[in-house]
Amino acid sequence: MYSYEPDTQIFSRRAMILGVGQLGLFGLLAARLQYLQVTQADQYGILAENNRVNIGLIAPLRGRILDRYGQEIATNRPNFQVVMIPEQTKDPIETLRVLEKLVPISPSRRKRLLRDIPRSRGFVPFTVAENLEWEQFAAINLNLPHLPGVEPQVGKLRYYPQDDIFSHMVGYVGRPDGRDLRRDDPLLKVPGFRIGKSGVEKQFDDKLRGSAGSRRVEVNNVGRVIRELARNPGIQGADLTMSMDSALQNEAISLLGEQSGSVVMMDVNSGEVLTIASAPTFNPNQFTVGLSQKEWDGLLDDQRKPLINKAIAGQYAPGSTVKMLIAIAGLEEKVITPEEKIVCEGQYELGGDTFHCWEHEGHGPMNMHDAITNSCDVYFYELARRLGIDPIERVAKKFGLGRPSIPGAFGEKKGLIPGRDWKRANLDAAWQTGETLIAGIGQGYMLVTPIQLAVMTARLANGGKAVTPQLLMNPQNASNTNDDLVSVDANGAENNDIQVDPAHLKLMHKAMTSVVNDPDGTAFGSRFNLSGVASAGKTGTVQVRRISKDERESGIIPNEELDWHLRDHALFIGFAPVKNPKYSVAVVVEHGGSGSKVAAPIAQKLLKMALERDRQPLKIKTASGAKFNKTKKNTAGTA
């Protein structure tokens, strides 16, 4: 009989081996499972959480920019906007058409949306419109039941409550462009984020920007946001308190009107800049939301160049406004005395060339005081010839001309005070005596900016203290400041004495006082008398075209009959009060025609306004944000 026992034994052995193997495999799986779920639970929990949770940046609230009294120049306001999530709409294109009837959508944005929406992942939101009026925003909310996939949102937008008054110096913000986005800064890619593009907004962007916030959101496997888990709003940027006075700035812009030019007013002792205006202006709020191509082209095509900050980047021949410096150089070099008289017959001859005085009939005998009061060109031709260019160059630079007043900041131009070395290096030619004569009346190669003229005037007024412009209140005590705004002289020292004989400065004060208050003075028509307080100054009318001999003989064409770009520039510098000077002012009106008729009245009205405001108790805002009452009053008939 056949036995099955050997086969059974073989089967049992195989089953045992298989069972042991299975047991071992399950043991390994159990051990691995224990390792993953127990030993590595925390690590894989974090990985799972990271796959489920996204962290995104939130743009911080930008710091404010304030004037010296705490009035807002730049702040933030609610930005009412409309966002569309394409996948939640029945028809994104049709929804866009409906929205166009409720809110304004620019042609460029509409074109971009029509192009990008079909290409996008449906859950990615698109900003359809922003910077909406409350009524428009309310209309969207009322129609939401009929607008699936549309979401009204309230963010923050940079806002300039005084519109164009500070447009050039404060600047504006805008969306990061291609060059910005190449920088390794994830905040630049956050929707709605703005950066400083010009002026103070750009110079202090890192201080004003603040620190980014963040939000943690739960997402599904395709990246769609399910819910928000946590939010950190970030830290608002630091506030900046500028030295400017909104009321004076507004008045300066108003006085310039439709003209092209600039005004700078500063404290002659502290250097605090109260007004730094450039015209025409532009509205920085337009840049915040984006200009249309037509608006941008209009700014570029305007011959008055509204995008240029003329106060610091406009370069002009100073004309007669520098005649006091020529006089000081003559006294320092002892080539003339204040009493010596030079006869003006209306022209000056040198080597066969004729140099004309603005007074064609001549002024007659002129001493230094009278020559400044009447702005006699012939007197200064002769004085410049005696001096040579070297002392003129030295004294001009000592008073702040030919070098930046705010080194490294805002794109300021340094102007030009020419000399022998400059001409040899730049024109490969020797200096000529005739060029010295032209420099003696502030023309030729010589170029200055309005802020340099204000600095020059301040140094003339304050007794030779090398004061420099300060654009922040108490910058040495402020933690949110930039050293670029604490100006220094060429030797790196702040507000040093520039080594001028006080007696020489006293002579200049008397002559400049006569310019405004003497009936023979070129600015007599714009004088003011505020309870015994008077001002001093100097006019300048700068020729921008060559007048031919034939035209002189037949009669010089009046400015008003010339094309705008051929008319003379109008300049005026001044300070007040005459006793204990406090404010200096410089006014340049491009192609304004006459310093005495156009620029001087603007300066005088501003000086008077500043003196009147000094008599009022005002709240000054310090750099720390605290306020204190400061009553400014006149003493001994001065302010």
Task: Give each language-model segment a name.
Residues 2-5, 219-229, 269-321, 325-586, ...:
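Beta-lactam-recognizing serine transpeptidase/beta-lactamase-like catalytic domain environment
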